Amino acid sequence: MAGAEPDHESRLLPLVGNVYVPRDELFGHLKQSDFLGYTLKALVDGIVPAIRTYVDLSPGEFDSFADILKLYEGGIKLPNIPALEEVRKRFPLQLVKDLIPMGGDFLLKLPKPQIIKADEKAWMTDEEFAREMLAGVNPMMIKRLTEFPPKSTLDPSKYGDHTSTITEAHIGRSLEGLTVEQALADNRLYIVDQHDNLMPFLVDINNLDGSFVYATRTLLFLQGNGTLAPVAIELSSPLIQGDLTTAKSTVYTPQHAGVEGWIWQLAKAYASVNDYGWHQLISHWLNTHAVMEPFVIATNRQLSVTHPVYKLLHPHYRDTMNINARARGLLINAGGVIEMTVFPRKHAMPMSSMVYKNWNFTEQALPDDLIKRGMAVEDPSSPHKVRLLIEDYPYAADGLAVWHAIEQWVTDYLTIYYPNDGVLQGDVELQAWWKEVREVGHGDLKDAAWWPKMHTVAELIKACATIIWTGSALHAAVNFGQYPYSGYHPNKPSASRRPMPSPGSEEYALLERAPEKAFILTITNQFQALVGISLMEILSKHSSDEVYLGQHDTPAWTSDAKAQEAFRRFGARLEGIEKQVVAMNGDPRLKNRTGPAKFPYMLLYPNTSDHTGQAEGLTARGIPNSISI
């Protein structure tokens, strides 16, 4: 599409809006991704205003968990406002028929998320709450606890002492007879620590209308049966003392009856709010979508399409720039859906930008990440050269198998073209590619000591394996479980609105009288929930023509028989992993594979063997080659 100057491109509207995408990065294949763009636009332009009108005309709150379940059983009717009519006129006929039926009110009816399909109350159990830290949608936050009480890394000159207030008295009775020192020594204590991540932003976040968020620490104990149990949750809010932002902290421990049982449910909910926000902004958007862009750009700018590294990486870039452009125009833009629904709101992008300053490419490799978090140790005798300290850690167990398969494929492929380090060092295109990745794509981090020098074949193998892992398996792990786990928002609320009820308060009295209502009034409001859930349903679906890891959409991608054979072996390894995943999910000893919700962990099931679209839709299984949604 040329403008006044034939040598220049103009932007394609309406889908990518004002975010420029190079011509060869636009969706060139007429596939479900095209409908995705229209669907997101329809959500923002039509359905969101209709939801807002519905909430304004109704009481504006869910009354109970049963009231929320009506979303999946009969749906709710949204008013037929002019914005919906405008969407009907502007968008493709088939999409309009499927998404916004002609005439009358628009029925917002959602499929029942997997987390409540088998048991509508399983999400409330401590076991499921903890299991999702190992097999949920954000299973890369948990760390092994190495000191007690947990310490803070916040600058004491600005924040004072933020050492945790959790004591042995809080957790001692929950350690199966061990002392804290013994539990630490035996690798039995773990933590999901959001305190330092969020505390610097909480003053601003809690100054927003209708927002009250805590910085949380969740302490977990590895039980003898291999499952985790939450033993304490610390809720901290900022306390300004002179020039210092100190913390006011309260520790909650498990209770399962009466009003104290509901206080514990709320403590878990506040921790889940932290997890939801971090997942959306950091684990998902930043650490998969955003970080791929410098590699996509440098590869297209510096490597010819016939270069072996281009051929290796290109399938893992498919549609990424385009979907990111749509996200910037519709989702993460100022006032967009993410700011509407996720607790940092207008502070979301500043927060993710701040986190990016500490990003380290070498730590994105799964084994390195697990070792850094203390979840694994190096072990040359183990199949993947690292040994998990929690054996039944589904994300890590499946992830290591997939990582190893990727690494082996990359090794087999690259050693065809780089038999020694000298050949690599003499490859001018490759060296220019890596120079741009480091010095242009990451100009602010170019002097970091951790960057590979790209002097050895081993460095290239690790770098390419990390890029492929990020664009395929890591994104699959954090994306396709969004609706299955968070589509029922009491399980994964995106925001909290008021502090923990204190005895004698009106809120505490409501918690005693109508606990579900009090819980609902504390978490994500109705408007945020309806918009957020509608978005997650769109983003969690596999398309009908998905290309999965170990598959290729261009059979003639290379004429090199050795490369073709190496790729065939890669596919065979992935199909072997599929069988392993199914077998582990059926092993009753591995309790974290399915949990109380009876929802088997399949997010890292490769789905390489599927050539007929069996994983289409909200199946929560399959690893696409690239970030295309």
Residue ranges and their predicted role:
Residues 1-629:
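Long, compositionally biased charged/polar stretches
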